[in-house]
Amino acid sequence: MTPTYYLLLSALLFSIGAVGVLVRRNAIVVFMCVELMLNAVNLTLVTFARINGSVDGQVMAFFVMVVAAAEVVVGLAIIMSIFRTRRSASVDDANLLKY
């Protein structure tokens, strides 16, 4: 497979994730769409690393995965806090945590 197909797939995945973030109101679905966008970026990094013949993109993709794992922990804790407070996982209720 040529790298063009991987880059097109990455752009498609990123676009699906971006539309999901902009359209959906459920915090868990928005969170999954952000993770989809991060995985699309990882695919792009690995593809460019393969094109250039270096491992720099693969190392960056590894660090993005590590940061994404930390993001999952913090994000789910925030979503659980919103749900416990408001009995809803809606993004619209996220600004109500300050009270």
UniProtKB/Swiss-Prot annotation:
Q: Which UniProt keywords apply?
A: Cell membrane, Membrane, NAD, Quinone, Translocase, Transmembrane, Transmembrane helix, Transport
Q: Which residues cross the membrane?
A: 3-23, 28-48, 59-79
Q: Which EC main class describes this enzyme?
A: translocase
Question: What does the record say about its membrane topology?
Answer: Multi-pass membrane protein
How does this polypeptide assemble, per the annotation?
A: NDH-1 is composed of 14 different subunits. Subunits NuoA, H, J, K, L, M, N constitute the membrane sector of the complex.
This entry's Enzyme Commission designation comes to 7.1.1.-
Q: Which reaction does it catalyse?
A: a quinone + NADH + 5 H(+)(in) = a quinol + NAD(+) + 4 H(+)(out)
Q: What is its main location?
A: membrane
Output the Pfam families linked to this UniProt entry: Oxidored_q2
Give the organism, scientific name: Saccharopolyspora erythraea (strain ATCC 11635 / DSM 40517 / JCM 4748 / NBRC 13426 / NCIMB 8594 / NRRL 2338)
Which Gene Ontology BP terms does the record give? ATP synthesis coupled electron transport
Q: Which InterPro entries match?
A: NADH_UbQ_OxRdtase_chain4L/K, NUOK/Mnh_C1-like
Family recorded in the similarity comment: Belongs to the complex I subunit 4L family.
Q: Which GO terms describe its molecular function?
A: NADH:ubiquinone reductase (non-electrogenic) activity; quinone binding
Any Gene Ontology CC annotation:
NADH dehydrogenase complex
Q: What the protein does?
A: NDH-1 shuttles electrons from NADH, via FMN and iron-sulfur (Fe-S) centers, to quinones in the respiratory chain. The immediate electron acceptor for the enzyme in this species is believed to be a menaquinone. Couples the redox reaction to proton translocation (for every two electrons transferred, four hydrogen ions are translocated across the cytoplasmic membrane), and thus conserves the redox energy in a proton gradient.
NCBIfam families found in the cross-reference section: PRK05715.1-2 (NF004320), PRK05715.1-3 (NF004321)
Query: Where is this chain's protein located in or outside the cell?
Result: Cell membrane
Spell out the protein name for this chain. Answer: NADH-quinone oxidoreductase subunit K
